[in-house]
Amino acid sequence: MPAEVHGSPPASLCPCQSVKFRPGLPEMALLTALDDTLPEEAQGPGRRMILLSTPSQSDALRACFERNLYPGIATKEELAQGIDIPEPRVQIWFQNERSCQLRQHRRQSRPWPGRRDPQKGRRKRTAITGSQTALLLRAFEKDRFPGIAAREELARETGLPESRIQIWFQNRRARHRGQSGRAPTQASIRCNAAPIG
């Protein structure tokens, strides 16, 4: 028979979850959507059952979470079997915990360990003006594969770094792949035509 819970909420409930702890319930209790101890917003048909876990289950979940924020299915199944909680509930616990931690990290403006910081190690996007684009387009019409000398000359004319010129040509060739200076095919004309109707 499970022990009675007294005092504070189980550790498995993240502080940012909206479910309120209700003293007097067994530690491992499934609350149904029809349970009148649930808050009004959690009552009603179609709501999932809420799983309150024992301290030992919470400790096991937390220990696993601290080792790996994104455990694989085999790990989750093994953990679920070991602590006697259905695997889908373990999956949801991990999703909720990651979400809660992410919100806390955002509030404290610290980088989230589960994701790469998009600003770190990323070069700022180069803004290319209309006149620079016009110069590059004229050069592209003459030669789609300019050598280093031609790219350096374009860099002097546009004020852009040669490496950006090289990337611009790569991107432009990728956009125009398959046409290679030929007249556009009927298929490409149909694809680029404005929708009718």
Swiss-Prot record:
<keyword id="KW-0539">Nucleus</keyword>
<keyword id="KW-0677">Repeat</keyword>
<feature type="region of interest" description="Disordered">
    <location>
        <begin position="101"/>
        <end position="127"/>
    </location>
</feature>
<protein>
    <recommendedName>
        <fullName>Double homeobox protein 5</fullName>
    </recommendedName>
</protein>
<comment type="similarity">
    <text>Belongs to the paired homeobox family.</text>
</comment>
<dbReference type="Pfam" id="PF00046">
    <property type="entry name" value="Homeodomain"/>
</dbReference>
<dbReference type="InterPro" id="IPR009057">
    <property type="entry name" value="Homeodomain-like_sf"/>
</dbReference>
<dbReference type="GO" id="GO:0006357">
    <property type="term" value="P:regulation of transcription by RNA polymerase II"/>
</dbReference>
<keyword id="KW-0238">DNA-binding</keyword>
<dbReference type="InterPro" id="IPR051306">
    <property type="entry name" value="Homeobox_regulator"/>
</dbReference>
<feature type="DNA-binding region" description="Homeobox 1">
    <location>
        <begin position="46"/>
        <end position="105"/>
    </location>
</feature>
<dbReference type="InterPro" id="IPR001356">
    <property type="entry name" value="HD"/>
</dbReference>
<dbReference type="InterPro" id="IPR017970">
    <property type="entry name" value="Homeobox_CS"/>
</dbReference>
<dbReference type="GO" id="GO:0000981">
    <property type="term" value="F:DNA-binding transcription factor activity, RNA polymerase II-specific"/>
</dbReference>
<dbReference type="GO" id="GO:0000977">
    <property type="term" value="F:RNA polymerase II transcription regulatory region sequence-specific DNA binding"/>
</dbReference>
<dbReference type="GO" id="GO:0005634">
    <property type="term" value="C:nucleus"/>
</dbReference>
<feature type="DNA-binding region" description="Homeobox 2">
    <location>
        <begin position="121"/>
        <end position="180"/>
    </location>
</feature>
<dbReference type="InterPro" id="IPR000047">
    <property type="entry name" value="HTH_motif"/>
</dbReference>
<keyword id="KW-0371">Homeobox</keyword>
